[in-house]
Design a protein with these regions (language model features):
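Short periplasmic/luminal acceptor-recognition loop of GT-C membrane glycosyltransferases, typified by
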Residues: 56, 401-481, 497-509, 540-546
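Perimembrane helix-loop-helix junctions
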Residues: 176-206, 268-272, 372-376
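Membrane-interface alpha helices of multi-pass inner-membrane proteins
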Residues: 125, 142, 147, 155-171, ...
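Hydrophobic alpha-helical membrane-interfacial segments at the cytosolic entry of transmembrane helices
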Residues: 11-17, 190-214, 247-264, 275-289, ...
Length: 555
């Protein structure tokens, strides 16, 4: 009897998951991170420049999505741009998942390929739905992996473009890309492939340098000094990496001990017991540990379940190493995942959460490795263990992706649709909808009165405000900037003072984990200048300070 081809069924399952995600993207309004990522492209749209006008360290990747957001601006203005960016990412993630699935189907079983694609599709750092640099970094790294696993020069060149895009998302990734590329160029068997990859890197680098890097070298160097002194990233890469490792040790100390014990039991069982039962005791210990650990962190960050998969599959990987069963595609994915995790850990101050960006790729490498094992008794048990654990992680991650909400109320409270402005088409809580409508009305009044040449500054944080108007950003970054920020004072020494300063009420944009999102500090030279020279206007959710030099519309 001919075996039925299961590949279309798995492709249909991925498609159904993407449709669910596309619908879910219409719920939940994040007042901070998600819109902040879009402000980089908004600054370019308003005629400002990277580095010279924007002082946040993660700005470079905006060059990747600036063209498509600019096209949206031309066609539709700013209305609904928030939801548009979400759906663009869902479409990009779905396309990448399908490409990954088709690529891996050539290397391993369809079910393994489906699990790998599903693990990617269900992951989003922090459950942020938009074009975050975390998500795009993961996407471009997987696109590189898909290209590297093909045998065509054009695919290798395209992989180089994706690798360069990943470096724009996380610049510290270059610390792994450059040595890896040099090493590949030194190996005769890989030299041609590495040469084509390098050409792809050079293509995107040339585009970025030509169209996005300011030509004022002196100004760039001076601004880089300020960017590197960013108060939220002043610890340095080594400090952040060490902090992330310490955090993982604290969180998963008992899991590490248990998986070491499971590994010892597994190796001894394979050596001493009959082949049919040799792997079972060790795998049973690992399975029990995984279940307990998954339950322990069931309410943790989306992506933490990947830790359990990686940790409790270590005994199985150790057995593969002992038996010298090495799959090259699996090795590529595991090395890539480790490099991604380390790069993110050096780039971010969010400790253990940072490694979760690389863990899906590492987990794919584990699954592909287990799928490549010969069909013997112990190896079959390893494959089944990995597949079952991956299914559990996949289901938990998908459920968390749907039910958890980042910086908004619980899912069942997201009932109020927003019908205008950048967040049009998204549903949020009644309180947030009222705040949004009130602030949007205030901004429309300001736009009707004052010229778009005036710079605006929202404090402490309201990134979507910059998306709602044509006023250029008058702050070093749209990220959290308080009135007493030393970086704000330095910025105003080299840039014009903002003509419009919006001081938000502390409770604006509040969420369960951030009850006072816009708490401020009313001190410093900038605040003193506002008090002395600016005219205050009271609004329901903010106080607006107007400069005497503010330009009226039509003047």
């Amino acid at each position: 009897m001919e075996k039925r081809d299961s590949r279309p069924l798995y492709a249909a399952a991925l498609t159904a998951a993407a449709v669910v995600l596309a619908v879910r993207a219409m719920y939940g309004f994040c007042w901070s991170d998600e819109s902040f990522y879009l402000t980089f492209a908004q600054r370019l749209w308003n005629g400002q420049k990277l580095i010279l006008d924007e002082w946040h360290p993660v700005q470079f990747y905006s060059a990747l999505f600036y063209p498509i957001l600019s096209l949206y601006h031309v066609l539709f203005g700013n209305r609904g741009i928030y939801l548009f960016a979400r759906e663009v990412y869902v479409a990009l993630a779905f396309g990448t998942a399908m490409l990954l699935y088709r690529t891996l189907c050539r290397k391993c079983a369809p079910f393994t390929s489906f699990l790998c694609a599903g693990l990617f599709l269900c992951y989003s750092r922090g459950n942020i739905w938009g074009l975050s640099y975390y998500n795009l970094f993961l996407t471009f790294c997987l696109l590189f992996a898909c290209s590297a696993l093909r045998k065509r020069p054009w695919a290798w060149c395209l992989g180089g473009v994706c690798l360069a895009a990943a470096v724009l998302c996380v610049p510290y990734f270059a610390l792994f890309v450059i040595p890896g590329l040099i090493a590949a160029l030194c190996i005769p068997k890989l030299r041609k492939r590495a040469g084509w990859t390098a050409s792809g890197i050079c293509i995107l680098a040339a585009v970025f340098l030509l169209f996005f890097l300011p030509k004022d070298i002196g100004g760039v160097l001076a601004s880089l000094k300020e960017i590197l002194s960013d108060p939220e990233h002043s610890g340095g890469p080594v400090h952040y990496l060490a902090a992330a490792i310490r955090d993982v040790k604290l969180l998963y100390y008992y899991e590490a001990l248990l998986t070491a014990f499971a590994g010892a039991v597994l190796l001894l069982g394979v050596k001493l017991l009959p082949k049919r039962f040799g792997a079972l005791p060790g795998l049973l210990v690992a399975a029990c540990g995984a279940v307990v650990s998954l339950w322990r962190y069931r309410n943790g960050e989306l992506g933490f379940a990947y830790y359990q998969f990686a940790i409790f599959c270590l005994p199985a990987m150790a057995l593969c190493w002992v038996k010298r069963e090495i799959s090259r595609p699996a090795l590529l994915l595991r090395i890539l995942g480790i490099a991604m995790g380390l790069s993110m850990a050096m780039s971010s101050n969010t400790e253990a959460i940072t490694f979760t960006v690389g863990l899906p790729v590492y987990s794919m490498g584990v699954l592909v490795q287990l799928s490549a094992l010969p069909r013997e008794a112990a190896e079959v048990q390893l494959r089944r263990f990995g597949a079952v654990l991956a299914c559990v992680v996949l289901c938990l991650s998908f459920a968390s992706r749907i039910t958890s909400v980042f910086r908004d109320g619980p899912l069942n409270t997201l009932t109020e649709p927003m019908t205008s402005g950048p967040a049009a088409g998204i549903r949020t809580t009644r309180e947030h909808a009222e705040q949004y409508a009130g602030i949007l009305a205030m901004l429309e009044e300001l736009e009707d009165t004052y010229s778009s040449e005036n710079r605006i500054f929202f404090t402490s944080i309201l990134p979507w405000g910059y998306l709602a108007t044509d006023f250029p950003c008058g702050a070093p970054t749209a990220w959290r900037t308080k009135l007493d920020s030393p970086q704000l004072e330095s910025y105003c020494e080299t840039h014009p003072m903002p003509a419009i300063v919006v001081v938000l009420e502390p409770q604006v944009g509040a969420s369960p984990d951030k009850p006072m999102l816009n708490e401020n500090s009313f001190s410093g030279r900038f605040w003193e200048k506002l008090q002395a020279d600016y005219t205050p206007l009271e609004y329901p959710y903010a106080t607006v300070y107007l400069s005497p030099n503010a330009i009226l519309k039509g003047v």
